[in-house]
């Protein structure tokens, strides 16, 4: 199928599904109660999921964010796992998956891959809650499945998150906090970083936040890959969007002057999960990766007139600094890399969230990234230099109380634009604009049912993106980014229509 015909096909499918969603939601709106989702919390406390979520899981509203920041506690005796109101039938575990139809394509240099079919997105088994007063825990397990995804093959099991969080440690140093303030909390384990806006809580399922996962030298792709591309080696595999093992100190305090909240977090992260290529590996040896360095990530926010997701506004600053391992352990090549060979990298950014009328949320972030020259020197790149780039995204969410025309509650509409712009490549033979990214994501969700037990939503998502100059067909010298007349762009798009449910 020719590219322009394929685009018309995608658009026709999207228009048809939107019309179907509108009709179905209109018919069901008179039958379904307006109950607006880890359902385990709703079961525990006996309230509907809309107490903690905007009209649609998994995005948290102001109350839900505060509940999370306070260690999944309301501040009552009902928080305790031994409370008499919690029956033996309560199990603090939820499961979530999405079933439906997905179509995806990716093309580079006039050649590409197209997939499509019915399937599911995998399975998340989630458990969060309280072990005792001011002691929280979280576990997310993704089981290995022989037919996971939409025809993409088997998946491996992984413990995506596993942590314990100790709350209100300030009391041990003689500081008495006000009700609702949790000034000093310690989290240990593997967890999502306190990024400006949680990717795990995003309602989009098929499109990542580009700046959270961007790596200089590696062509950006989303959902599927497999086309021939050009790249250069970079030992730094750090992504702020990936869960990391470490320890985090964090706190939240009400600020009367702004009628909002001040939040902070500082995490120390181990590099044993780094998977970048290392120099010094003997031929024929499967060398170890990772390392024993400690990297840091921090985030501070101040909100005004609320938490800044449903009411009020919020501003923040965040950053990461660390050293990426670059050489194998000469004494034990199959062991983890040595700490002393690490080379520095940094990420610095700002974020903002604006709300209007309790229905609109405009939010976004900008980040500056830099990987040091010696990372690329370690890979044998001639005339290596620092790799520097800027990333950003902006998203508009609209959750109307009643959708105009159809007079139906329970809708969520989103649009997000992701952008990456490179200033300099670690390998100077690659063009400045190599791996620049423009990504557009459109989302419509209708919430069929949300209660204290189950959640189900109709989900329609479309993503289209372009990654500049990463083609390989016109490369003059193998291993370089010099093309004649130019390197081709990578073009990708994905459409997902399905039912997203949790229980």
Functional labels for PLM-detected ranges:
Residues 86-92, 100-121, 284-287, 330-338, ...:
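Surface-exposed strand-loop-strand hairpins of Gram-negative outer-membrane beta-barrel proteins
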Residues 115-119, 154-158, 238-241, 290-292, ...:
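Short sequence motifs at beta-strands and strand-loop junctions characteristic
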Residues 162-165, 170-172, 178-179, 308-503:
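Outer-membrane beta-barrel pore domains
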């Amino acid at each position: 199928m020719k590219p322009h015909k394929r685009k018309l096909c995608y658009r026709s499918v999207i228009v048809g599904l939107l019309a179907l969603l509108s009709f179905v939601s209109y018919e069901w709106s008179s039958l379904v109660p307006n109950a607006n989702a880890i359902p385990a919390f709703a079961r525990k406390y006996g309230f509907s999921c809309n107490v903690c979520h905007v009209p649609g899981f998994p995005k948290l509203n102001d109350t839900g964010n505060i509940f999370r920041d306070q260690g999944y506690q309301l501040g009552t005796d009902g928080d305790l796992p031994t409370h008499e109101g919690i029956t033996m039938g309560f199990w603090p575990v939820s499961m979530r998956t999405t079933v439906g139809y997905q179509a995806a394509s990716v093309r580079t240099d006039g050649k590409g891959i197209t997939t499509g079919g019915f399937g599911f997105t995998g399975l998340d088994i989630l458990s969060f809650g309280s072990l005792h007063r001011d002691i929280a825990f979280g576990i997310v397990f993704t089981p290995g499945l022989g037919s996971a995804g939409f025809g993409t093959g088997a998946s491996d099991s992984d413990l995506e998150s596993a942590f314990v969080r100790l709350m209100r440690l300030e009391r041990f140093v003689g500081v008495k906090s006000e009700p609702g303030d949790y000034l000093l909390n310690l989290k240990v384990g593997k967890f999502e970083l306190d990024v400006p806006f949680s990717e795990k809580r995003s309602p989009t399922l098929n499109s990542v936040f580009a700046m959270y996962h961007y790596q200089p030298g590696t062509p950006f792709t989303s959902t599927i890959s497999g086309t021939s591309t050009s790249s250069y080696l970079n030992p730094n595999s750090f992504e702020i969007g990936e869960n990391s093992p470490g320890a985090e100190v964090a706190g939240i305090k009400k600020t009367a002057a702004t009628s909002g909240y001040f939040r902070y977090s500082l995490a120390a992260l181990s590099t044993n999960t780094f998977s970048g290529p290392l120099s010094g590996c003997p031929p024929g040896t499967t060398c170890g990766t990772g390392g024993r360095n400690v990297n840091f990530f921090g985030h501070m926010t101040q909100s005004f007139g609320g938490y800044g997701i449903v009411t009020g506004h919020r501003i923040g600053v965040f950053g990461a600094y660390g050293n990426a391992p670059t050489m194998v352990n000469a004494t034990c090549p199959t062991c983890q890399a040595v700490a002393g060979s690490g080379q520095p990298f940094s990420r610095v950014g700002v974020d903002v969230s604006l709300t209007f009328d309790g229905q609109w949320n405009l939010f976004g972030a900008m980040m500056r990234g830099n990987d040091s020259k010696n990372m690329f020197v370690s890979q044998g790149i001639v005339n290596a230099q620092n790799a520097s780039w800027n990333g950003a995204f902006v998203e508009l969410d609209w959750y109307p109380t009643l959708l105009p025309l159809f007079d139906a509650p329970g809708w969520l509409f989103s649009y997000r634009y992701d952008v990456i712009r490179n200033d300099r490549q670690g390998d100077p033979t690659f063009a400045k604009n190599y791996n620049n990214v423009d990504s557009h994501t459109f989302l419509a969700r209708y919430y069929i049912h949300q209660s204290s037990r189950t959640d189900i939503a109709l989900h329609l998502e479309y993503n289209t993106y372009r990654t500049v100059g990463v083609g390989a067909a016109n490369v003059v010298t193998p291993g370089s980014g010099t093309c004649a007349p130019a390197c081709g762009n990578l073009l990708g798009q994905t459409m997902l229509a399905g039912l997203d449910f949790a229980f």
